[in-house]
Amino acid sequence: MGDVVLVVNRFVLGAGPVDERDVTGPDPDAERDFLDRAERALAALAGCAGFVHGELGRAADDPTRWCLATRWASIGAYRRALGSYQVKVAATPLLAEAVDEPTGYEVLRSAGADGITAEDSDRAPGEANRPPRR
């Protein structure tokens, strides 16, 4: 797979804490709005060079939790995509609502019909265990 990068953006619909005993889900209108915006964001990202695959999913056990997962040919391709006009218009406003956490992951192991494939990290030696600079 080479330099494939996995980007995971997680979202929580609705405001305030959810009572775990009564998870009824987000407001249907808010959910439709989120789905429409997420579909436009995914389409904009899919139109960029280096885009490999993308999916939007909802948590099976909590209808307020969503995930937009995309795969890119490289971290550079993903970062260039974020700079495109169409992505700035259609995706950036949605991505700004994502849970504030790291989103880009280098793929080091993958599984397929042929078994497990191992990839080396692109991080410099000694950097693999060092926290990111802030």
Per-range role (PLM):
Residues 1-3, 55-64, 90-134:
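Glycine-rich beta-strand-turn "strand-cap" elements at beta-sheet edges
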Residues 2, 31-34, 74:
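Generic alpha-helix initiation/capping and coil-helix boundary signal
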Residues 2-5, 15, 20, 104:
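Low-complexity, intrinsically disordered short peptide segments enriched in small/polar/basic residues
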Residues 5-11, 21-22, 55-83:
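Short, well-ordered beta-strand segments in beta-rich or mixed alpha/beta enzyme
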Residues 13-15, 74, 106-109:
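Non-catalytic surface loops within mature trypsin-like serine protease
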Residues 15-32, 113, 117-128:
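Intrinsically disordered, low-complexity terminal tails and inter-domain linkers enriched
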Residues 17-53, 86-90, 94:
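Short amphipathic alpha-helical segments
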Residues 46-52, 71-105:
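An amphipathic, aromatic/His-enriched active-site/gating alpha helix that lines ligand/cofactor pockets
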